[in-house]
Amino acid sequence: MLERTLRVLEYNKVKEQLLEHTASSLGRDKVKHLVPSTDFEEIVEMQDTTDEAAKVIRLKGSAPLGGITDIRSNVKRAKIGSMLSPNELLDIANTMYGSRNMKRFIEDMVDNGVELPILETHVAQIVSLYDLEKKITNCIGDGGEVVDSASDKLRGIRTQIRTAESRIREKLENMTRSSNAQKMLSDSIVTIRNERYVIPVKQEYRGVYGGIVHDQSASGQTLFIEPQVIVELNNALQEARVKEKQEIERILLMLTEEVAVEADIVLSNVEVVANLDFIFAKAFYAKRIKATKPIVNNERYMDLRQARHPLIDPEVIVPNNIMLGKDFTTIVITGPNTGGKTVTLKTVGICVLMAQSGLHIPVMDESEICVFKNIFADIGDEQSIEQSLSTFSSHMVNIVDILEKADFESLVLFDELGAGTDPQEGAALAISILDEVCNRGARVVATTHYPELKAYGYNREQVINASVEFDVNTLSPTYKLLIGVPGRSNAFEISKRLGLSDRVIDQARNHISTDTNKIENMIAKLEESQKNAERDWNEAEALRKQSEKLHRELQRQIIEFNEERDERLLKAQKEGEEKVEAAKKEAEGIIQELRQLRKAQLANVKDHELIEAKSRLEGAAPELVKKQKVNVKNTAPKQQLRAGDEVKVLTFGQKGQLLEKVSDTEWSVQIGILKMKVKESNMEYINTPKQTEKKAVATVKGRDYHVSLELDLRGERFENAMARVEKYLDDAQLASYPRVSIIHGKGTGALRQGVQDYLKKHRGVKTFRYGDMGEGGLGVTVVELK
């Protein structure tokens, strides 16, 4: 990709924003080296990877990338035998922990059913080095100091140091508290000079304490003396400190050697977490600019829906639909300057660059983008003073370079093509240049203010005109792109709005040819038609989305209904079988007891009476099972079924009409607005004459369950009551009830208020009111359902 193209399309500014979302210098380094790819498979994988990270952010809010630093140079130094400092080792341990934590985070999400195949592959490359991590953290504290517990020897040495320091301080403090101390000392303190304990002695008393002078004050009046009585103690302390330093170095070398052994694994883990930091930075950036994953195709067309420029505030910019490559390969945007043509041009270019870099782009869902091997852009005034080039010459140098390199795998962006010279010659050059790049199969977007190019889009099959809408009422551009409508100057309308007289404007119109006037009028009508068509499309699209949403909701309710029904059937069957088993055991017990009584001659009971009693008890058991079980699947209907027959679908308890037979055992059935496949064993033929369909109250829970027309909540706790209201309204809607009543009582009014607050937000509620005098008054709410 040409560096000039990246510069004029402000690709580096996008990277600067992306840098703000990295968690470490590792991720920042990846962003700095980011360039668009031209490999189709790589781009698709990068987009899928960013999408998985975006899914993690949607579900979890963030990713645990804290504590990770760039430890690569430290690890490489360890490999060649250089001793690492405590802080360097601590950075390695923290990064090992961060990589292990990230691996566990992704694996936990996968274990919980979240599909993250690409991220799972990434974290699978992370090798846990828990033992090495713990060795380092057991030896080095959070502040970067080697702790006493790093070795028994170090603990012993530090005990000696603390003991020696305590003895020295005790002796010196006794000296400072003596009766003569106030006279001989400048201050009653114990301090340190040259790593040895000293006291501040006045110059004239230096011989009283003996020992060694280590320092003096700026005035020379105070000497910092190590008294003779503690010289040996200070010497012992220094020896212990030397031993401490040697032991610390031994521990650091030992840890460094262990890092060196695992260096290749550590470096591999670092590369993985660097990529993860980079991936999640792209996902966070997508969230920031409200971007989505585009569909990447290899067929050289793009369909950007509601595209926005990522560097412009999304609350300010006007999104546009931009299509290129299917019905036309070139878009020529005409119209006056300051209308937003250049922004549109840059939006196309930066969206392509971002997509080919694995970044999501600021467009609506289902947008498509293709892969270009080269992107050329001639945008802005980049004339060179040193080369003494004019604006026109500067553009032409760039255009010559583009014409030498552009091919069918190129996207070419021209801003104000042919500008900077005589309008007639400039327009002619613009047409020839466009013809040249179009003939090479390149995809082209060009802006121009030359009116001669308006006809260009009508005379070439693969070229279409476009313009940026201008509001003559506000005298400002709306920045709305109108594809298929060439731009017009609007000079007469603007002049009239600003107060120029009709007489002057009419005279001006007379100076323009009739054909030009006709073209301007035609363009105005095209603009109006475009607006109307777009408005109609938006309304139709809104209805389509609403219908899809309703369809999904109905499917969800049916699935929930089936699951709940099956659960109840299983529960009822289990309870029935338990009751049967209990009855059998009780019967056996009774019979056994009767036999024992007879043997004891305490009762006159015959065998045939015992057998008869047992048979009655056993006969009751199948009946109980029969009552508990509900046969969902009946035998196939005996009636020969044909398309158009009315049947009852047993699993739903709903009527439907047969559409067509899809297999030997299955039919396509229309049930209300739903169409589904149903097995013949799951339906009953209804032998009724065809008549005008009437809406009936449906039994939605099977043959033994009916939805009541009222729900009584009196005595319920608030949370339980709300849950019952939610389920009851869903059941009532499935049963097609037009109206139901909810009894909440009068009481304190809290339950009544809670019910009515919930009804206000329920999507299936049309209206609601208090009950009339005969309906329960303020203790009842009557609900009208949609």
Curated annotation (Swiss-Prot):
Pfam families: MSSS (PF20297), MutS_V (PF00488), Smr (PF01713). This is Endonuclease MutS2. Homodimer. Binds to stalled ribosomes, contacting rRNA. SUPFAM superfamilies: DNA repair protein MutS, domain III, P-loop containing nucleoside triphosphate hydrolases, SMR domain-like. Belongs to the DNA mismatch repair MutS family. MutS2 subfamily. Residues 711-786 form the Smr domain. It is an enzyme of class 3 (hydrolase). One of its GO terms (biological process) is rescue of stalled ribosome. Endonuclease that is involved in the suppression of homologous recombination and thus may have a key role in the control of bacterial genetic diversity. Acts as a ribosome collision sensor, splitting the ribosome into its 2 subunits. Detects stalled/collided 70S ribosomes which it binds and splits by an ATP-hydrolysis driven conformational change. Acts upstream of the ribosome quality control system (RQC), a ribosome-associated complex that mediates the extraction of incompletely synthesized nascent chains from stalled ribosomes and their subsequent degradation. Probably generates substrates for RQC. GO terms for molecular function: ATP binding; ATP hydrolysis activity; ATP-dependent DNA damage sensor activity; endonuclease activity; mismatched DNA binding; ribosomal large subunit binding; rRNA binding. Keywords: ATP-binding, DNA-binding, Endonuclease, Hydrolase, Nuclease, Nucleotide-binding, RNA-binding, rRNA-binding. The keyword Nucleus does not apply. ATP binds at residues 335-342. Its EC number is 3.1.-.-, 3.6.4.-.
